[in-house]
């Protein structure tokens, strides 16, 4: 078994992660005759409920601020023991004055789930919190509320990167967060494969995540750490945008070198195809769109047939850790479309007669950058994942040939490419927007092609960050941040030296 532990840091991260977990729950089958391609033990843990019944809950830690959990309780129906209506006053014989905060009323969607009724149609108006469309029970240890700050507070906003960094330091000093929160989940794993983090990177959660990843790297050594770093894509006032930009720069400078995979995600993306209808002001809708690409791109990590996803990301030398997230929604009739190939029993880079052996530059959705000029960029490494359609009949090379092909690509300065195909289509659940996609199957599913791409576009983004940091950041921090961003940028630049360059030397 190769388990993956997940950490969810903050409101925007929890919106995206809730869609992710709802999708994982939808893959469960309840009949021995039904087989699934998904190994549920990767993300779910068995346990015992309060009444002695068996449970199956996510391997995750959900961090958020006070007031951000909505109607979600730490102790749910699986783990809640019945208590006496009047427990008595014990040794105290004086008057009691009990003050309780007004509880948040569960959404109609949650009420219907609890009663076993058909779920009502959700809308941007009816979703107030990420818990309003959550379909799972979590273990009580998974729910971690940080009471030092309150959601959307005007008095103490959780916005500055240093605030998150300081909060983690204070909590870790008092409680040892890894020992208190993460270790119980880690000790349950037979063979921990990776740690996956959902976090926003342009506010205080970026600082919190940076300190957390630093501790994870100390504790878990060479284990893979995958970070989904959410950045606000909506327009804001200039001074707020500068603050966001500096928070993003600090996050990518501190977190990406410690990560195996760092994916900046624009929420929402700048450009949308005509086939997608999106309420850009709704976090529920924008995170649902992101989940189609993010969940598809990582689907190989959950297959029963083990895939060495980490090697695919590493490319030839493992120097590129910042990847772009891109996707394309494909029509049901795939007869005239490009198709990546992956035999469920044999994984590898390969060439074929069609376009499936070539890297893709054009996608309908680009979740990482708002620069439309992608044609001139150099691609170092790309992992493509296609789902929901039958691949063209192609014969992959043997494993013996794959290493040679990879070396040939490297020495010829060609992009490293890995393609996966999974016949499981992306399901449109009742917890997601119903009419977001105009192209979909009759059975409420869609075909998706997603990609994780390491390219020279990252160098352009980092260079812009350096310029802003040089103007805005204080003197004490400026040199370290600008130089650090410059060192990361060098890995994503393409520098060609001719023979005359050497002759001049």
Curated annotation (Swiss-Prot):
Species name = Neosartorya fischeri (strain ATCC 1020 / DSM 3700 / CBS 544.65 / FGSC A1164 / JCM 1740 / NRRL 181 / WB 181)
Mitochondrion listed as a keyword: yes
Q: Superkingdom of the source?
A: Eukaryota
Q: Name one Pfam family in it.
A: Tubulin_3
Please give the residue ranges the record annotates as the region Disordered. Answer: 333-358
State the UniProt keywords alphabetically: Mitochondrion
What are the subcellular locations of this protein?
Mitochondrion
Composition bias, kind Basic and acidic residues: at what positions? 344-358
Tell me the protein family, please: Belongs to the misato family.
Its GO biological process terms?
mitochondrion organization
Source gene?
dml1
- What is the name of the protein in this document? Protein dml1
- List, alphabetically, the InterPro entries matched: DML1/Misato, DML1/Misato_tubulin, Misato_II_tubulin-like, Tubulin/FtsZ_GTPase_sf
């Amino acid at each position: 078994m190769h388990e993956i532990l997940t950490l969810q840091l903050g409101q925007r991260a929890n919106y995206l992660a809730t869609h992710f977990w709802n999708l994982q729950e939808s893959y469960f089958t309840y009949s021995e005759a039904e087989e699934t391609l998904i190994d549920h033990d990767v993300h779910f843990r068995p346990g015992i409920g309060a009444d002695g019944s068996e449970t199956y809950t996510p391997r995750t830690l959900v961090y958020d601020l006070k007031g951000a959990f909505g109607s979600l309780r730490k102790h749910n129906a699986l783990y809640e023991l019945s208590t006496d209506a009047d427990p008595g006053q014990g040794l105290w014989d004086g008057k009691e004055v009990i003050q309780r905060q007004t509880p948040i009323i569960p959404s109609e969607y949650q009420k219907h789930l609890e009663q076993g009724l058909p779920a009502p149609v959700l809308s941007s108006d009816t979703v107030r919190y990420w818990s309003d469309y959550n379909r799972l029970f979590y273990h009580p240890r998974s729910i971690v509320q940080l009471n030092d700050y309150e959601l959307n507070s005007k008095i103490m906003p959780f916005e500055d990167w240093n605030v998150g960094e300081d909060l983690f330091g204070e909590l870790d000093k008092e409680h040892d967060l890894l020992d208190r929160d993460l270790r119980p989940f880690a000790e349950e794993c037979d063979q921990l494969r990776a740690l996956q983090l959902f976090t926003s990177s342009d506010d205080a959660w970026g600082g919190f995540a940076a300190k957390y990843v630093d501790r994870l790297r100390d504790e878990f050594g060479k284990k893979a750490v995958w970070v989904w770093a959410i950045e606000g894509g909506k327009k804001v006032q200039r001074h707020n945008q500068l603050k966001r930009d500096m928070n993003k720069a600090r996050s990518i400078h501190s977190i990406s070198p410690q990560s195996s995979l760092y994916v900046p995600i624009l929420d929402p993306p700048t450009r949308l195809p005509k086939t997608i209808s999106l309420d850009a002001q709704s976090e529920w809708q924008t995170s649902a769109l992101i989940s189609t690409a993010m969940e598809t791109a990582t689907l190989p990590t959950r297959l029963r047939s083990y895939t060495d996803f980490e090697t695919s990301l590493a490319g030839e030398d493992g120097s590129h850790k910042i990847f772009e997230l891109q996707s394309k929604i494909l029509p049901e009739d795939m007869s005239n479309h490009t198709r990546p190939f992956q035999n469920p029993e044999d994984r590898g880079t390969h060439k074929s007669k069609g376009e499936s052996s070539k890297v893709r530059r054009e996608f309908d959705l680009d979740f990482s950058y708002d620069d439309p000029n992608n044609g001139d960029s150099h691609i170092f490494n790309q992992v493509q994942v296609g789902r929901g359609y039958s691949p063209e009949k192609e014969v992959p090379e043997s494993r013996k040939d794959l290493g040679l092909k990879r070396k040939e690509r490297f020495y010829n300065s060609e992009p490293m490419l890995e393609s996966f195909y999974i016949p499981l289509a992306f399901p449109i659940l009742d917890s997601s927007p119903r009419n977001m996609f105009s192209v979909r199957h009759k059975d409420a599913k869609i075909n998706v092609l997603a990609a994780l791409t390491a390219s020279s576009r990252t160098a352009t983004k980092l260079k812009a960050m350096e310029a802003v940091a040089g103007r805005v950041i204080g003197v004490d921090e400026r040199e370290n941040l600008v130089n650090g961003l410059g060192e990361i940028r060098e890995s994503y630049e393409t520098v060609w030296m001719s023979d005359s360059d050497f002759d001049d030397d």
